[in-house]
Amino acid sequence: MKIGVISDTHDQIARVKKAIDIFNQEKVEIVIHCGDIVSPFTLQFYKKLNCPIKFLLGNNTGDILLHLKYAKNFGLRDYEFGTFFSLNLGGKKVAAYHGDNEEITGALIKCGDYDCVFSGHNHISRIEKIGKVISVNPGRLLDNYKEGANPPSIAVYDSNTHDAKLINVAD
């Protein structure tokens, strides 16, 4: 099973559209958004996804009731909002959390309950294997905000190979 992972989109409409196109091309079966959607108007673009999406609330989410209203008004299908997801996907136990508390993120990785931990928040894309756990932070969609920062990116995790890849979504 292929799982799309995106985070910290911060209203970057062109890159959100590009990410959705990539997820559809990759034939992911679900997308996990690790938080910081920011403005609810951007939810309309996720309608083009060919799969369900789960949105984590980040530290820049804004009014959750407004997000729920917009999701419904835009006709977004098969979606869910939450602060934490513990999921069984493709035979793997997956934890998804925004990542704004590094101690919690670290505890999820080290606890032994999960095969995968998806997080965001710090805008630093990385894929790291820690023991049997793969930790995926897809990075952000914002422009490079500091010298030497990784380019804007998303990630795709494959439960069959227990591996992930980062995909550059820079313009």
PLM features: residue spans?
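Beta-strand-turn-beta hairpins that frame and shape the catalytic cleft
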Residues: M1-G4, S86-A95, K129-S135, T161-L166
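Core catalytic region of metal-dependent phosphoesterases/phosphodiesterases
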Residues: K2-N88
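Active-site glycine-centered loops adjacent to acidic/histidine catalytic or metal-binding residues
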Residues: D8, D36, G58, H98, ...
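N-terminal non-globular leader segments, chiefly Sec-dependent signal peptides
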Residues: I13, F23, D163-V169
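Short, Asp-centered acidic motifs that coordinate Mg2+ and/or phosphate
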Residues: I30, V94, D115-C116
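Conserved beta-sheet core of the metallophosphoesterase superfamily
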Residues: K54, D100-T161, L166-I167
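Active-site-proximal segments of metal-dependent phosphoesterases and phosphodiesterases across multiple
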Residues: T61-G112, L142-K146
